[in-house]
A protein has these predicted regions:
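Cleavable N-terminal signal peptides
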Residues: 14-15, 25
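Conserved hydrophobic/amphipathic secondary-structure segments
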Residues: 28-270, 338
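An extracytoplasmic/periplasmic, membrane-proximal ligand-sensing/linker region
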Residues: 35-39, 223-226, 250, 268, ...
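Structural beta->alpha junctions
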Residues: 46-47, 276-280
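A short beta-strand structural signal in non-transmembrane regions
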Residues: 270-276
Length: 342
């Protein structure tokens, strides 16, 4: 097969031009690079629900802290409880700092439990930060009158969830392990908002969810005793739930407690923001700083408080450490955790 010298020369010229553009992009200062750019703050859920709400608040303010005054828009990429978005970041998204976003932290332990199904190693992603730590619990609608100690073995409970990939499903599964016969997950809802509507209509008994989501989106539920909180998933009780038992008070086995710790460790990274693997180092530093500066912004703080959103920021470096600790959980704890999820 003969290849002309002209064709080879032309190919070399194109390659050199592409290389020059790439080098130029890498060499640009952050302010120069982001100037006039449109940045996509993505979220692995449809509009509605807690993740979307936190994403929109962050997207509203983070742009002023990114050098160059770029335009920040929200891009919803729902699917498989944000797994579709994670896979997009992993394989498709540019690594230049123009696309990053929020995903379901429950995928982190799931990636260890079911590595083939998830297909993502969260230690490889670029960690920008987390907007808060979370506190999860399971509840039933107040009219049901269910008491975890007295009624768990006698009354059937239906708990709504979006899918087995959702963060809430982890807590539903742990709760279900207390009485597999009576606690029934009902999957297939598109958003948490749809689950809560079904609960209000009497189609479901309850849900396992985040305290912050309830406080921001259903602020009357707890103060007006519209829901009964059955169990909270943490080692210590939340100040607003002093009379609700923790899962660690109900379980007695130390091995079970270690497995639960693995499953709920991602609570510390409540609203995680990540970029694609191998993001350029200077863009990583720029976005991490922009995130922390946003979290300290008085205007941001005032706006979040109006929406009753809890904020407890975690740096990208610290979030990456927690992701690494989840990934390196001892096999025996992972195996026991897997049984909880069956």
């Amino acid at each position: 097969m003969k290849v002309s010298l002209a064709l080879l020369t032309r190919g070399a010229a194109v390659a050199a031009a592409v290389s020059a553009v790439s080098v130029q992009a890498y060499a640009q200062a952050p302010e120069e690079f982001y100037s006039g750019k449109t940045v996509q703050f993505m979220v692995g859920y449809p509009p509605s629900g807690g993740f979307d709400a936190y994403t929109r608040v962050a997207a509203r303010f983070i742009g002023k802290h990114i050098p160059g005054n770029s335009t920040v828009i929200v891009n919803n990429m729902p699917g498989a409880s944000s797994l579709q978005f994670v896979r997009y970041l992993q394989s498709v998204a540019p690594k230049d700092g123009t696309q990053f976003g929020m995903f379901n932290r429950g995928l982190m332990p799931k990636s260890v439990l079911e590595p083939k199904e998830v297909g993502a190693d969260f230690t490889k992603f670029t960690w920008i930060g987390s907007m808060n730590s979370e506190h999860s619990f399971c509840f039933t609608w107040g009219a049901k009158g269910i008491n975890i100690i007295k009624d768990l073995g006698t009354k059937p409970i239906t708990l709504g969830e979006t899918s087995k990939n959702s963060g809430g499903y982890i807590y539903t599964s742990i709760f279900r392990s207390l009485n597999p016969e009576n606690i029934k997950p009902v999957l297939g809802y598109s958003t948490t908002g749809h689950i809560w509507l079904a609960i209000e209509r009497g189609e479901l008994d309850g849900n396992c969810t985040l305290l912050s989501s309830i406080e921001s989106q259903k602020p009357d539920w707890l103060p007006q005793n519209k829901i009964d909180v059955l169990v909270q998933f943490s080692e210590t009780k939340h100040p607003s739930l002093p009379n609700v038992p923790t899962i660690f008070e109900i379980l007695t086995s130390e091995n079970e407690k270690k497995a639960i710790n693995f499953l709920i460790a991602s609570e510390q990274i409540g609203r995680p923001i990540i970029g694609p693997p191998s993001m350029q180092a200077d863009r990583t530093a720029t976005l991490r700083k922009a995130f922390l500066d946003m979290m300290k912004d008085p205007e941001f703080d005032e706006f979040a408080k109006k929406l009753k959103m809890d904020m407890d920021p975690l740096s990208g470096e610290k979030a990456a450490e927690i992701a690494s600790s989840i990934q390196s959980t001892p096999p025996e704890a992972v195996e026991l955790a897997r049984k909880f999820m069956e």
